[in-house]
Amino acid sequence: MADSLVLLTGATGFIGFRILIELLRQGYSVRAVIRSAGKGQWLESRLTAVMKGSDYKDRFETTTVADFVTDGAFDQAAENTSYIIHVASPIVSSDNPDDWEHDFKRVAVKGSIGVLEAAKRSGTVRRVVITSSMVGLFSPKALFAEPSEVPLNAESRIPEMEPPYAHKMLAYQAGKIASINSAEAWIKNEKPAFDLVHMHPSFVTGRDDLATTREDLRKFSSNWHSMQIVLGHKNPIGKPILTCHNDDVARCHVLALDPKVTGNQSFLISCSPEDGSEWDDVKKFVQREFPEAVAQGVLPNDGHMPTVNKGVRFDVRKTEETFGFKHIPYEAQVLDVVKQYLELPEKDEGVEISTTA
């Protein structure tokens, strides 16, 4: 119900902020979890800028949870809420592989289970939606190396990945796998009054309303997969071209709150690449739509990233049929980001609001 209170984690991130905007536009009241007062001030400033002219302030509040892995961390935040959308992922700064099992895997599991336990204790929550990833469903081999004999779907589950992890991406994947497996086991064992929905986006692309400068868009995020090519970077490490628009990700999360959507299931969010599609296709899109910016060197448009496993395929029919939409194609995803890049100043000349205090 659109007048219900939703607890949202991760609202200060690329995906979470877009979900916050969508919730408010659809009439929900939102209690956003922040980690510090400084984050709250920054979030409210960006919300004011994006939602200007919209009457939302009486439907938005923040609550501080400094440490997501503390027992009962979300209990107070979840009081009197009808839904929880858990988007936040562990914040990892260590480059020491010995830390990654804790930082990626244990923290991810603790956060998800903590949210579920808070939902149970609240006595009011009807559904929890957790943001996972395509890497929570499929092995690295299935995504990066093996053509799909049949399209991969959201019903897939894989065993947990144990350390050591060769690089951070594998540790991140281990966290996503452990999180979904643990959360589903918790639901099966606890049999709470609420249900659970997992969302599994591929590489998320699209306008980032948290960005205020071009410099912000050059920082690493999933948008960087395409923008690095537009900005002339040559990356020797390839990836499968599996992408989705941030608008579609937000839409799925919010529509999943509808009680008409059956709970205790997963949804894969990804557009279907056309045969022969490559990451470098972005160059022809940009040349066609922004020729002056290319000619002037604002968009070098001469980068490269290899496309691997062109034979991988996803079955997203359940997602599109349940939520009643067609995924935004890769071309539109990329052009939205490039258009925003050209609209923004190079650097922020105004007063900076701390995002770390």
From Swiss-Prot:
Residues annotated to bind NADP(+): 172
GO MF annotation, one: oxidoreductase activity, acting on the CH-OH group of donors, NAD or NADP as acceptor
Record pathway: Mycotoxin biosynthesis
Domain of life according to the entry: Eukaryota
EC number of the protein: 1.-.-.-
A Pfam family annotated for this UniProt entry: Epimerase
Enzyme class, first EC level, given as a word: oxidoreductase
UniProt keyword list: NADP, Oxidoreductase
Purpose of the protein: Ketoreductase; part of the gene cluster that mediates the biosynthesis of cercosporin, a light-activated, non-host-selective toxin. The perylenequinone chromophore of cercosporin absorbs light energy to attain an electronically-activated triplet state and produces active oxygen species such as the hydroxyl radical, superoxide, hydrogen peroxide or singlet oxygen upon reaction with oxygen molecules. These reactive oxygen species cause damage to various cellular components including lipids, proteins and nucleic acids.
Family: Belongs to the NAD(P)-dependent epimerase/dehydratase family. Dihydroflavonol-4-reductase subfamily.
Protein name according to UniProt: Ketoreductase CTB6
